Amino acid sequence: MQDAKTYLSIAPVLATLWFGFLVGSLIEINRFFPNALILPSL
């Protein structure tokens, strides 16, 4: 039971850090390459 409580207290922190890192990288990539997220028209 202690492991479950530890997981439930650590998981939101790890998820927040991961999504913060992901969003930050996407913003920085989009800043340097503004059209990289748009698929080129064929």
Swiss-Prot record:
Keyword Plastid: yes
Gene3D superfamilies listed in its UniProt record: Single helix bin (1.20.5.510)
InterPro entries from the UniProt entry: PSI_PsaJ, PSI_PsaJ_sf
Coarse class of the protein's main subcellular location: plastid
Membrane spanning stretches: 7-27
GO cellular component terms, A-Z: photosystem I; plastid membrane; thylakoid membrane
UniProtKB keywords: Membrane, Plastid, Transmembrane, Transmembrane helix
UniProt subcellular location: Plastid membrane
One of the Pfam families matching this protein, by short name: PSI_PsaJ
Membrane topology listed for this record: Single-pass membrane protein
Classification via SUPFAM superfamilies: Subunit IX of photosystem I reaction centre, PsaJ (SSF81544)
PANTHER family: PHOTOSYSTEM I REACTION CENTER SUBUNIT IX, PTHR36082
Its biological purpose: May help in the organization of the PsaE and PsaF subunits.
Family to which this protein belongs: Belongs to the PsaJ family.
The protein's name in its UniProt record: Photosystem I reaction center subunit IX
